[in-house]
């Protein structure tokens, strides 16, 4: 008869002395009963896997595992004896067909209210959800799960190139990793390209005009047109709502002689703009700021100027037949218009 001393994997204390009979399966059954675990493998003190009962000698010291890798009791930092609880033992996860080995403490301690913590804080809760290798089955994307597991290990968000942050964010929300969700939302926001608020050049605007069919509307709502020069341009039927034509440096936008028939420029900022002899027939300029604008000789027939600020605007020689001047912000003096 041979006898051996059995210890839990990684533990140097609280061993059990048992007799060795029959096959290796018989020894694993005895170990499971004595140590209160589901024994699947046995190692010697040097980490060698015992796969044959004949390899065991009398008075050998053996370490019993539940499927996790061998842990050397001489170097393992886990607390001894009764402190070796369910929150420090190893387990393997099968996430979408890919295996991850970690500890219960990693899944439980950092985010105790997460789904992973609830799944694994009590030993054996998910015992019926294991594959043939004993790994716990989780039907999620392994590519997005890996950054989450690493975050639970060391507290840093590290995502490899080629992995979509939005995918990691959805997994973090699914597992309830609240602190990681905040990191990911900031990272996604910082990864977005900055908005371009630079002024549009005359060359760029003319290119828009040339690329737009004559029967189609040109839409430039909210464009920044500070100091733009568009002399004699043809923008008939264009939409220029809420555009900014005012340059803080003092350079004034110049649309002298431009064809702006039917243009929608409602709410645009056009202080000091030059619209001399431009055609604005049937245009919509409601609520525009036209302070100091040059509208001399401009065709404003049937133009809607309701709510505009025309203080100090030059309207001499302009055609205001059928123009609408309702709800003006400042009085319109007769000296400003002769026609």
Curated annotation (Swiss-Prot):
- As recorded in Swiss-Prot or TrEMBL, the protein's gene is named Kctd9
The entry describes its oligomerization and partners as: Forms pentamers. Component of a complex mades of five KCTD9 and five CUL3 subunits.
Q: What is this protein called?
A: BTB/POZ domain-containing protein KCTD9
State if Iron is listed as a keyword: no
UniProt GO MF annotations? cullin family protein binding
Q: What processes in GO biological process is this protein linked to?
A: cell maturation; gene expression; intracellular signal transduction; natural killer cell degranulation; natural killer cell differentiation; natural killer cell proliferation; NK T cell lineage commitment; protein homooligomerization
* Stored PANTHER family: BTB_POZ DOMAIN-CONTAINING PROTEIN KCTD9
Q: Which PROSITE patterns match?
A: BTB, KHA
